[in-house]
UniProtKB/Swiss-Prot annotation:
It is an enzyme of class 2 (transferase). Keywords: Acetylation, ATP-binding, Kinase, Nucleotide-binding, Transferase. Belongs to the ATP:guanido phosphotransferase family. Residues 9-91 form the Phosphagen kinase N-terminal domain. InterPro entries: ATP-guanido_PTrfase, ATP-guanido_PTrfase_AS, ATP-guanido_PTrfase_cat, ATP-guanido_PTrfase_N, ATP-guanido_PTrfase_N_sf, Gln_synth/guanido_kin_cat_dom. GO terms for cellular component: extracellular space. ATP binds at residues 122-126, 185, 229, 280-284, 309-314. SUPFAM superfamilies: Glutamine synthetase/guanido kinase (SSF55931), Guanido kinase N-terminal domain (SSF48034). This is Arginine kinase. L-arginine binds at G64, V65, G66, V67, Y68, E225, C271, E314. Residues 119-356 form the Phosphagen kinase C-terminal domain.
Amino acid sequence: MADAATITKLEEGFKKLEAATDCKSLLKKYLTKSVFDQLKAKKTSLGATLLDVIQSGVENLDSGVGVYAPDAEAYTLFSPLFDPIIEDYHKGFKQTDKHPNKDFGDVNQFVNVDPDGKFVISTRVRCGRSMEGYPFNPCLTEAQYKEMESKVSSTLSNLEGELKGTYHALTGMTKDVQQKLIDDHFLFKEGDRFLQAANACRYWPTGRGIYHNDNKTFLVWCNEEDHLRIISMQMGGDLGQVYRRLVTAVNDIEKRVPFSHHDRLGFLTFCPTNLGTTVRASVHIKLPKLAANRDKLEEVAGKYSLQVRGTRGEHTEAEGGVYDISNKRRMGLTEFQAVKEMQDGILELIKIEKEMQ
């Protein structure tokens, strides 16, 4: 049972949400009085309550989603809130649906989407993973952060071939290394106000770090928003090469570190928007003609379930007609299907851009 102080805070938070008529978050939409009453006293075995789930969305009324999972059990215990939010965000992933088993498919189906190098500046595929047996950020202790980091760094130090590289702990990092990682756009900063409010940045920078291979085409973030963010990237449009590298790495790491997986929801992550495959495949792409015809761009993007963002990611503008375009769907389809959908969409965008020139 949640304690009285927590329940009081929850009641206040619920009142604040109810009063916020211009709040458009999925939290506000689905945290009805009956769902609230059903969940307010519940507590996971690691001690997480509904307050841990909703506090970021209560503090930041401009959130798009507004909920985070403090631990893996939260997705089950607080499912009357999570399930409708998941269904709404991952369009069409119904509460009776089951995410398919992991399937990276035939990696040779992926190609260089821009062999002439005229449109695509860079290509990146990432996934998120949580380590089994550990809660997510808000419930982690300082000792757990350290323990996880040592498991991750020793696991990664065994990677070979193209993936061989160096682990840099954020704790005690020298200014030189820090600057170098910033210049390479590798360094992650302490969380934004949404993550701060979710208590995702405690004991910072303990247990946080960055691994990269010698070529700087493979990157692992340890204990940023998720336990692990595994990233493969390079300049140009060779999606095939980027995808193959990621798949090799994930399969290798998985042999040594068991990941949290849910029968219905797939791979578990801190934020429900990343569940399922957790895969985000993206390109930075120059589309000057389509940029001038935003409706056409959005129409094609919609057809292939692509998300169009500004150059520097979420909530930014396109600089010089350069967009960050990625797959939108992560749940209810396989890893292969998610990336294939993105490849098909990018090829179509390039074809249309060429026709408009």
